[in-house]
Amino acid sequence: MDYSENVQNKNFTPISQPPNLTRDQEHAIMVSTLRQVISNTGGDTSSSHYIAASEALPPSDAGPCPLCGVTSCYGCAFPQHEEIKQEKKHKGVRKKPSGKWSAEIWDPSTRTRRWLGTFPTAEMAADAYDEAAAALVEKRSARRGSKKGEGSIHQEVGGGDD
């Protein structure tokens, strides 16, 4: 029996292992490769996908990433990471699948979430949350009453009988 196929060739050089990529990074590479195939661009079709993907990634000895500070970070080079960085986070505000923004606030007196509405922008939803939070603070301070010598948070200006 000939077992020559199990013997390694002395001229064989092993291919270096690909870097550990996250699922999002692999997905981005596959999508860009498919776009190149569908649009019939991308140059030489005989080159391996790993080589094409590794050219899109920054070199591993590039130093720490300016966004996250991790050495040899591959995630910050992808657009999904940049989009996440650009979004501001507002308390009580979340983005719905439809692209609109919803706002809600926890009402401790009724122990329920109070729906504030759906808004076209995150800033409008945050403003609605801020107004509702201010109303809750007013309600709480009015319920507690002001102590002797202390004024309320929102003092009335003028219009009083002297």
UniProtKB/Swiss-Prot annotation:
Chain intervals for the UniProt region annotation (Disordered): 1-21, 84-103, 139-162
UniProt-listed SUPFAM superfamilies: DNA-binding domain (SSF54171)
Any GO BP annotation: ethylene-activated signaling pathway
Taxonomy, superkingdom: Eukaryota
Gene3D superfamilies for the chain: AP2/ERF domain (3.30.730.10)
Record localization: Nucleus
InterPro entries, A to Z: AP2/ERF_dom (IPR001471), AP2/ERF_dom_sf (IPR036955), AP2/ERF_ERF_subfamily (IPR050913), DNA-bd_dom_sf (IPR016177)
Annotated keywords: Activator, DNA-binding, Ethylene signaling pathway, Nucleus, Transcription, Transcription regulation
GO cellular component, one term: nucleus
Molecular function (Gene Ontology), one example: DNA binding
The entry's DNA-binding region: 89-146
Pfam families, per the entry: AP2
Basic residues biased stretches: 87-98
Matches recorded under SMART domains: AP2
Family: Belongs to the AP2/ERF transcription factor family. ERF subfamily.
Free-text function comment from the UniProt entry: Probably acts as a transcriptional activator. Binds to the GCC-box pathogenesis-related promoter element. May be involved in the regulation of gene expression by stress factors and by components of stress signal transduction pathways.
Name assigned to this protein: Putative ethylene-responsive transcription factor ERF121
Source taxonomy: Eukaryota, Viridiplantae, Streptophyta, Embryophyta, Tracheophyta
Gene: ERF121
